[in-house]
Amino acid sequence: MLALYHFAQSTCSIKVRLLLAEKQLIWQDKMLVSSEHNHLSDWYLKLNPNGVVPTLLDENSPVFESTSILEYLEDKYTETSFRPFDHYMRSQMRAFLVFVDVWPTLAVRTPSFQFGGLLKKFSAMSDQEFSELIKKDP
């Protein structure tokens, strides 16, 4: 069974939910609450070391980064394909996905993490805890 860890308002989560719906796949809703910083908890970081949403869990194998999840779903569930068949149009689709990943996503992700999660998490740590964290994952 597929399980999707996501935020309701996340644009990256929305695009994965749209494809799940269009493919009519059954999935378990694992809604996280951004203000609770679940995505930065130890258990979630084991699923997704980047600490971002969404993360798709399929047979206990985590797939993360929304565009990678879209590709995974297209590759695995081929009954209904949403990729263009024409090679040129497929290249245009990929260019659009890169654009979405680079510009709007980064514009939203950086302030979300800086002010919404990481700043609070790091501010609550002692100097020793912060030093240990940096040694573990520079």
What are these regions (language model features)?
Residues 1-137:
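GST-like domain detector, emphasizing the conserved glutathione-binding G-site
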